[in-house]
Design a protein with these regions (language model features):
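Metabolite-binding pocket within alpha/beta catalytic cores that recognizes anionic/polar moieties
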Residues: 1-134
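Active-site rim beta-loop-alpha module in soluble metabolic enzymes
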Residues: 121-184
Length: 184
């Protein structure tokens, strides 16, 4: 989750909570759910914060800190990011749960990594000033695990900022005033 105050909203569904840790913007609750170890953690907003969290969680289980080298046996973590999002579609209400089918990335974080797992990826030009944006399709098996009559399937957009990149204007003029309307 992004907001540290939302971690208890997730961990209250755990069978047990063994430990609670808070440092700066990170709130972590560690426990058990259905016999499995589970962790709820805040990441803060934005892909830059999520990048830090993903790297550091991976390092905790896959790096030998005495040598700073990868361990011989690599573990794979199952990470599910829960977050809040605005909607540009009027039929989607504030309290609805949306599962992301396609994720559109307007930032450039994805360009810094080589992924071994193959996802359905696309590059497309939305606006000339943005250059190419990256579109990734969600894993179909994972979507099927969570899809129900209580969820909607839709697309989400990751913007590299809260104001201009999402069409919000304060005092600075925007290069594209109607970016959200054009995306919808």
């Amino acid at each position: 989750v992004g907001d540290p105050d939302r971690v208890p909203e997730v961990s209250r569904h755990f069978d047990t909570i063994h430990k609670k840790i808070r440092n700066r913007e990170f709130e972590i609750h560690i426990g058990k759910l259905g016999g499995h170890d589970i962790l709820a953690m805040s990441t803060g907003m934005g892909t830059d914060n999520i990048d830090i969290v993903m790297q550091e969680l991976d390092a905790l289980v896959n790096v030998d800190f005495s040598t700073m080298e990868a361990k011989h046996e690599i573990k794979s973590l199952k990470i599910i990011r829960l977050g809040t999002s605005g909607s540009i579609q009027p039929h989607i209400s504030v309290d609805q749960i949306l599962l992301t089918d396609f994720a559109i990335s307007m930032d450039n974080l994805h360009r810094h990594y080589v992924l071994k797992r193959k996802f359905e990826n696309y590059e497309m030009e939305l606006f000339p000033f943005l250059g190419m944006v990256h579109v990734t399709r969600a894993d179909a098996d994972l979507l099927n695990q969570f899809q129900s009559h209580k969820t909607l399937l839709g697309n989400t957009l990751t913007a590299p900022g809260f104001y201009g990149p999402q069409g919000r204007k304060t005092r600075l003029p925007l290069r594209e005033d109607s970016i959200i309307e054009k995306l919808s």
